[in-house]
UniProtKB/Swiss-Prot annotation:
Its EC number is 2.5.1.-. It comes from Aspergillus niger (strain ATCC 1015 / CBS 113.46 / FGSC A1144 / LSHB Ac4 / NCTC 3858a / NRRL 328 / USDA 3528.7). Polyprenyl transferase; part of the gene cluster that mediates the biosynthesis of yanuthone D, a fungal isoprenoid epoxycyclohexenone that acts as an antibiotic against fungi and bacteria. The first step of the pathway is the synthesis of 6-methylsalicylic acid (6-MSA) by the polyketide synthase yanA. 6-MSA is then converted to m-cresol by the decarboxylase yanB. The cytochrome P450 monooxygenase yanC then catalyzes the oxidation of m-cresol to toluquinol. Yanuthone D is an antibiotic against C.albicans, methicillin-resistant S.aureus (MRSA), and vancomycin-resistant Enterococcus. This is Polyprenyl transferase yanG. It is a multi-pass membrane protein.
Amino acid sequence: MSTTKRSVTTRPSTSSRNVPRGIWELARLHTRESWLCWYPSIWGACVAAGVSDTVLEPLAFARFLFGIWASVTATHCAFCTFKSVPFCFFVVPRYSSDYWHLDKHVQRCKVRPLPSGMISTPEALLAFVCWVPFTFAITWATLGPAVTVSFIPVWVLSVIYPFMKRLMPFPQVVLGAIIGGAVFPGWVGVTGDLDHLDQALPLFFATAAWVVYFDVFYATQDLPDDKKAGVKSLAVWMGPNVKILLAGLGILQIAFFAMTALRADLSLIFWILGIGVWAVSVPWHVLSLNLKDRHSGGSVFKANIKLGLYMTGVSLLELVLLRVHHAPMKVY
């Protein structure tokens, strides 16, 4: 670990109790992390329009995008809160709450709301309980019943995910399925079809590979602490060979994005500005990772937030130029 970087700061004692801010930060609303979750839904909608040859009416599609943003953000808030609550000891009583409270064991995370004392565990649990009906209601109200049904696998896997960091060496695979699964609500919102979601699988696999990829970069920040605490991750499992894994995941992303573009008959806009730029970014990410500097992985993770935003912009550009016209669109 580099000794030249700034050390992790701790919160002053005067700010240790701040429940509203604690709820805000537990939901990760002070970060851009939720962006990584709604990108795939927008990709799903854009690709579905190509596969189904759907013409979209601008205002209806704008309302749909708002629904996707609101629903995915609420889902992210709810389950980030859930992930932070060390309640798992109620389910597995032979372990203490500290065993499941991973933030206490990671230096970078000790300033988060629960370990810093900003909010108590019962208060955090109550916040999660409040997020659940809100998430369901906003999804149903803005996107309708079919899209709400397509969210169910995402919600179920989000309940399972926090346990996986203690129970399996590759929890990022579960996270990949969760965020990759956000492709399907976007797809269903355009097609209204829950029966032919196999058409969305190439995009799902591209997204899932990308999620595992960027989360492995993120996990390299905490390698010393994770090893000491027994936290499981692909970064810990692969150790010094992690760059081989990252390169393989990069190849998978590009291959599945190419398959997606072929099946949806996407234009050169997506091929050149989207896949082309993505293919150049992957080797740059892998070569930029310095395992001796725990801040290196965090920098590449942030670069992937920007890359996902860029791909979302490219997808919307192609959609607007080719498929958004003044014609009726039914949002399901």
